[in-house]
A protein has these predicted regions:
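Conserved donor NDP-sugar-binding/catalytic core segment of glycosyltransferases
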Residues: 103-134
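Acidic helix N-cap motif at the loop->helix transition within catalytic regions
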Residues: 21-24, 49-58, 99, 103
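Conserved nucleotide-sugar donor-binding catalytic segment
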Residues: 84, 137-217, 221
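A conserved acidic beta->alpha catalytic loop
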Residues: 29, 44-54, 71-73, 95
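Glycine-rich, basic loop-to-helix element that forms the pyrophosphate-binding segment
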Residues: 70-86, 107
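Short, well-formed alpha-helical segments that are part of the catalytic scaffolds
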Residues: 18-32
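Short aromatic/hydrophobic "clamp" motif used to bind/position activated sugar donors
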Residues: 91
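Cell-envelope/extracellular polymer assembly enzymes that use nucleotide-activated donors
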Residues: 8-11, 39, 182
Length: 259
């Protein structure tokens, strides 16, 4: 199996904005994978710091790293630029301030190829950016269908990979928040079932601060996805929006001292 997995081509997509202080950690996290990617595409979304120069300086060490520069347009357009450029069979996402364990790609892609899975995700840790301490672990469901995803998004983008050779090119809806969830809806609408790969191999580095305004804006964008992408009427859109709103205010990671 190991040799077969090593022959699989993976494109890693990283959206970056003013990430000069963290992008090297991200690049080295991908470089440390026991299953090396075919390419690591970094989209500099109009940064006004030294993000691009840090990436360029590392390209001699990691020649498979590619950088795409664009005016500031948001995460959806940045990731879409990466998807458009991706040439690997599998596409995986890792934003600039997040990291993976060395076994993430090998575990995930091995699981997908062994089980004919086209869309997969996994658990991830919350890391406090200021102290680098582990806050807890987000546990993903074993399976996700389109119907499940209509009621919420219980997975993290940093854990996801999909088989673009089988599913084709798909692009995220052009909203500032919730674009990844809208993308998972696209991947599963035809009956494709998402599956959880084993272990916990991703780390989400969380900054502090109030998220109240962000949660309201995200709710608006989620409503737009129901209306514009899924073509639901107002009443049906509001019906499905409610679990998102409740979840946004109650969701928290499983903390290790809770078992």
């Amino acid at each position: 199996r190991g040799q077969r997995v090593r022959m699989v081509e993976v494109s890693v997509i990283t959206a970056a904005y003013n990430s000069a202080g963290v992008i090297e950690r991200n690049i080295r996290s991908v470089a440390a994978q026991s299953l090396p990617p075919k390419e690591h595409i970094i989209i500099d979304d109009g940064s006004i710091d030294d993000t691009a120069s840090v990436v360029e300086a590392l390209r001699s060490e990691f020649p498979y790293v590619r950088i795409i520069s664009q005016s500031n347009s948001g995460a959806a357009r940045a990731r879409n630029a990466g998807i458009a450029a991706a040439t690997g069979r599998f596409v995986a996402f890792l934003d600039s301030d997040d990291t993976w364990s060395e076994l993430k790609l090998a575990t995930q892609i091995g699981f997908m190829t062994d089980n004919s899975v086209l869309f997969s995700y996994g658990d991830y840790q919350d890391i406090d950016t200021a102290t680098e301490t582990v806050l807890g672990r987000h546990e993903a469901p074993e399976r996700l269908t389109y119907s499940d995803l209509l009621r919420g998004c219980p997975i993290g983008c940093l854990t996801v990979a999909f088989d673009q050779a089988a599913l084709g090119k798909h692009f995220m809806p052009d909203v500032r928040r919730g674009q990844d969830w809208g993308f998972w809806l696209q991947l599963t609408r035809d009956g494709t079932v998402g599956r959880r790969y084993p272990g916990c191999h991703a780390c989400y580095h969380r900054a502090g601060g109030s998220l109240s305004a962000a949660k309201f804006s995200k709710a608006v964008d989620i409503y737009r996805i129901y209306r514009e992408q899924e073509q639901f009427g107002p009443a049906r859109s509001l019906y499905y929006l409610l679990p998102h709103v409740v979840g946004a205010w109650t969701k928290r990671p499983v903390r290790y001292d809770e078992g």
